[in-house]
Amino acid sequence: AKNYPTVSAEYSXAVEKA
């Protein structure tokens, strides 16, 4: 999620992992 500067993008990554 470090590649994403926005929290929303980081959240998306978390969902993608799940």
Curated annotation (Swiss-Prot):
Top-level taxon of the source organism: Eukaryota
User: What other comment is given for this protein?
Assistant: On the 2D-gel the determined pI of this unknown protein is: 5.9, its MW is: 26.5 kDa.
Q: What is this protein called?
A: Unknown protein from spot 443 of 2D-PAGE of etiolated coleoptile
Source species: Zea mays (Maize)
Lineage of the native species?
A: Eukaryota, Viridiplantae, Streptophyta, Embryophyta, Tracheophyta
